[in-house]
């Protein structure tokens, strides 16, 4: 279906009390306006015209990679004026969909229904019925058809009783919309050019206006303050949690789970409370994620357990691994099958071989570790000299004792043993024992100093 979209995003967002443009505030980890852009892109919009005003530099920096045409509304003179700034780019025969950057949850299904419902030469309008319509423009009907929209400040007492309200979302043909926009005036209580006045213009020409309801009322709720943003965040997360539960993922408490990206799960996945998923995450069969974990852009294979309060970003974890608690896997970390990393272990740009373990208080950076190797508590790969990074290579079946410092670049061959407390600066041959611990001394009869009175 051939259509282009106009997204209105020029508002300042005064009630957000922020230096950031309102539409850049995030919902589920990405700016509100990006949710709208992504929905349009997914539906195949030919063009996406983004009307901006306040915080233009911030907007363009944050959305630099988005496929939008930037349209400046230098003065905020109303919604009609905003759409009119983009109208020179409208094709006469294309459908124009008007959306809002602070209404992030509108669904593809609702938009498709609206596009399908547009009558020839007329307007398809998205409306919703509210128990308390205060503050919204009212839908005025005459013997059934929609004939006008009256804003709250311009409504008379009878019109204020109407519960069907305008969401602002509409579809019209480009040539018709340009003509109606050209005829707008600002003779109203707010002194603005209302987009809603095109409804009356279409009716006066004898063109039909078709009202469509959204799949869910939450879709058309806008954000004017942080409380409303928090409400939409919880609504979005509840919907994501419901989908995962229906797909067989066991969320121990759906109300305490945040999905801020995409999650692919195998069978019998279990996710405990307060877990945050960001970016693209893949979990294999029988994976268990403990409470308080943060997973970002990572892949975790079958039968792996991630214990509580672990952070995994840009890493791959093999089958039957154990991670955590309190582990940090940074970008480039790779755990091969049946490997273990435990509490307060940090791994960055390092591969831990099959069956190897680093169970306590360890930093492994820029390292390659073979199979069945044990890394003792307190071991550090000293990979950075203040200017450059260097690699540590540890072979198969190596035992590294506690509190060892491995000063890269250094290689430890298969079967070697590094004694506890060693500072290693030279390569170790296969099967060697290396220890650099200072000689132990015992002093008999020694007494502790006594504080002077």
Curated annotation (Swiss-Prot):
Keyword terms: Acyltransferase, Cell shape, Cell wall biogenesis/degradation, Cytoplasm, Magnesium, Metal-binding, Multifunctional enzyme, Nucleotidyltransferase, Peptidoglycan synthesis, Repeat, Transferase
Binding positions (Mg(2+)): 102, 224
Gene expressing this chain: glmU
Region span, Linker: 227-247
Taxonomic path: Bacteria, Pseudomonadati, Pseudomonadota, Gammaproteobacteria, Vibrionales
Subunit structure as annotated in this protein's UniProt entry: Homotrimer.
Reactions catalysed: alpha-D-glucosamine 1-phosphate + acetyl-CoA = N-acetyl-alpha-D-glucosamine 1-phosphate + CoA + H(+); N-acetyl-alpha-D-glucosamine 1-phosphate + UTP + H(+) = UDP-N-acetyl-alpha-D-glucosamine + diphosphate
A molecular function GO annotation: UDP-N-acetylglucosamine diphosphorylase activity
Protein name: Bifunctional protein GlmU
Pyrophosphorylase: region residues: 1-226
Pathway: Nucleotide-sugar biosynthesis; UDP-N-acetyl-alpha-D-glucosamine biosynthesis; N-acetyl-alpha-D-glucosamine 1-phosphate from alpha-D-glucosamine 6-phosphate (route II): step 2/2; Nucleotide-sugar biosynthesis; UDP-N-acetyl-alpha-D-glucosamine biosynthesis; UDP-N-acetyl-alpha-D-glucosamine from N-acetyl-alpha-D-glucosamine 1-phosphate: step 1/1; Bacterial outer membrane biogenesis; LPS lipid A biosynthesis
């Amino acid at each position: 279906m051939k259509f282009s979209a106009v997204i209105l995003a020029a508002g300042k967002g005064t009630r957000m009390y922020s230096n950031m443009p309102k539409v850049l505030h995030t919902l589920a980890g990405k700016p509100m306006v990006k949710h709208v852009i992504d929905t349009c892109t997914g539906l195949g919009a030919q063009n996406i015209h983004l009307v901006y005003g306040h915080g233009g530099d911030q907007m363009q920096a944050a959305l630099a990679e988005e496929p939008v045409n930037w349209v400046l509304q230098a003065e905020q003179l109303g919604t009609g004026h905003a759409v009119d700034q983009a109208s020179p780019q409208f094709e006469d025969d294309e459908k124009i969909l008007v959306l809002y950057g602070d209404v992030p949850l509108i669904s593809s299904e609702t938009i498709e229904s609206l596009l399908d419902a547009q009558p020839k030469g007329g307007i398809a309008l998205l409306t919703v019925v509210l128990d308390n319509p205060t503050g919204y423009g009212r839908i005025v009907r005459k013997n059934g058809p929609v004939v006008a929209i009256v804003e709250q400040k311009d409504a008379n007492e009878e019109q204020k009783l109407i519960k069907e309200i305008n969401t602002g979302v509409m579809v019209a043909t480009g040539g018709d919309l340009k003509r109606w926009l050209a005829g707008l005036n600002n003779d109203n209580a707010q002194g603005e050019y209302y987009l809603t006045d095109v409804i009356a213009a279409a009716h006066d020409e004898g063109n039909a206006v078709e009202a469509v309801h959204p799949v869910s009322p939450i879709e058309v709720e806008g954000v004017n303050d942080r409380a409303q943003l928090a409400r939409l965040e919880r609504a979005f997360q509840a919907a994501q949690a419901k989908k995962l539960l229906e797909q067989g993922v066991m969320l121990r408490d759906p109300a305490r789970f945040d999905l801020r990206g995409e999650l692919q799960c195998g069978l019998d996945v279990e996710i405990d409370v307060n877990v945050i998923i960001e970016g693209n995450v893949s979990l294999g069969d029988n994976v268990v994620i403990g409470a308080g974990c943060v997973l970002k852009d990572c892949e975790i294979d079958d039968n792996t357990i991630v214990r509580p309060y672990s952070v995994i970003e840009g890493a791959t974890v093999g089958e039957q691994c154990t991670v955590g608690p309190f582990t940090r896997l940074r970008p480039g970390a790779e755990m091969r099958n049946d490997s273990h990393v435990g509490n307060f272990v940090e791994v960055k740009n390092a591969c831990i071989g099959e069956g190897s373990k680093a169970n306590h208080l360890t930093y492994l950076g820029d390292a390659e570790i073979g199979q069945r190797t044990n890394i003792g508590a307190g071991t550090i790969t000293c990979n950075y000299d203040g200017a450059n990074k260097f690699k540590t290579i540890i072979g198969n079946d190596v035992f590294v004792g506690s509190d060892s410092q491995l000063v890269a670049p250094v290689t430890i061959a298969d079967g070697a043993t590094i004694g506890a407390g060693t500072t290693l600066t030279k390569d170790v041959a296969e099967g060697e024992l290396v220890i650099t611990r200072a000689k132990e001394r015992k002093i008999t009869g020694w007494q502790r100093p006594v504080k002077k009175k």
